[in-house]
């Protein structure tokens, strides 16, 4: 369970690299994707081993990167979300479908004006 705060994000999530399989690199590049990818900014997996000489930054770096993806994807809603998020095998596609589903009906969400006190508490989390 990850409890969001700016400090926790910087320490536990922001350094988690994207990851992919060596067998997919050529196909991705031929489609104009992953052009800036390297062993410095991505974890590359071949068969059952990590190719990066230094290994993983965190034992669960893949999970942490999925959290990073979810934070970025859900930020595209355009307003802070106060709520819980749980995913199994999360992906950009799944996050996109979630966002579309939530925004499809105004009954699925509530826009609220926060009191000054709540705003101050919220700002502490991101300070």
Language-model segment annotations:
Residues 1-127:
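C-terminal regulatory domains involved in ligand/effector binding and gene-expression control
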């Amino acid at each position: 369970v990850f409890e969001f705060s700016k400090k926790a994000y910087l320490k536990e999530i922001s350094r988690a690299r994207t990851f992919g399989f060596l067998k997919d690199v050529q196909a991705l590049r031929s489609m104009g994707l992953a052009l800036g990818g390297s062993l410095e900014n991505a974890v590359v997996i071949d068969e059952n081993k990590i190719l990066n000489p230094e290994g993983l930054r965190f034992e669960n770096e893949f999970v942490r990167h999925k959290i990073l993806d979810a934070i970025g994807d859900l930020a595209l809603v355009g307003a802070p979300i106060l709520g819980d998020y749980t995913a199994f095998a999360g992906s950009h596609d799944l996050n996109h479908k979630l966002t579309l589903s939530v925004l499809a009906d105004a009954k699925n969400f509530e826009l609220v004006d926060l009191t000054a006190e709540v705003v101050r508490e919220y700002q502490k989390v991101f300070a």
